[in-house]
């Protein structure tokens, strides 16, 4: 992906990714159970990331790569990117059990993703804490004018996370 992604490589890659998982007719913006679950899961992540960013004094509307004029969560969307695979993984693992209107159990499963584990800085931590570590490490990078030291998470498959 190039700077500013003028060739829309990220979008094309996402399209290919979802079609590989759910079939050649899958459209990400369609009104269906899979998209409902993806949207709900991403909203949970976005909320947790926003909470952490605001606690460090960031304005979530001012993004690094996401710069939508009418998006109040550009920075949140930047920071949630490394966590998206955990939602994708859960939805793929559960897509046959989803209904267009998500059940309470579906929603609880997606909310509980914040309690799944990731590796961050060589330690196994909950996703909700990995988010905080990522933001804290970003603050440190800014304060020290260095690019290395950003604690990016490594998502652990659910069956290995226990």
Where are these regions (language model features)?
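Active-site helix-to-loop segments that bind/position phosphate- or nucleotide-bearing substrates
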Residues: 1-162
């Amino acid at each position: 992906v190039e700077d500013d992604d003028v060739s829309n490589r990220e979008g094309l890659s996402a399209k290919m990714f979802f079609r590989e998982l759910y079939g050649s007719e899958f459209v990400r913006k369609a009104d269906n159970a899979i998209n409902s679950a993806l949207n709900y899961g991403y909203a949970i992540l976005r909320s947790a990331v926003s909470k952490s960013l605001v606690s460090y004094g960031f304005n979530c509307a001012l993004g690094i790569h996401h710069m939508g004029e009418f998006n109040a969560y550009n920075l949140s969307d930047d920071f949630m990117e490394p966590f998206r695979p955990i939602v994708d993984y859960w939805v793929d693992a559960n897509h046959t059990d989803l209904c267009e209107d998500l059940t309470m159990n579906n929603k609880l499963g997606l909310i509980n993703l914040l309690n799944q584990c990731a590796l961050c800085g060589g330690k196994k931590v909950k996703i909700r804490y990995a988010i905080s570590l990522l933001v804290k490490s970003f603050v440190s990078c800014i304060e020290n004018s260095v690019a290395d030291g950003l604690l990016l998470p490594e998502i652990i498959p659910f069956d290995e996370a226990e």
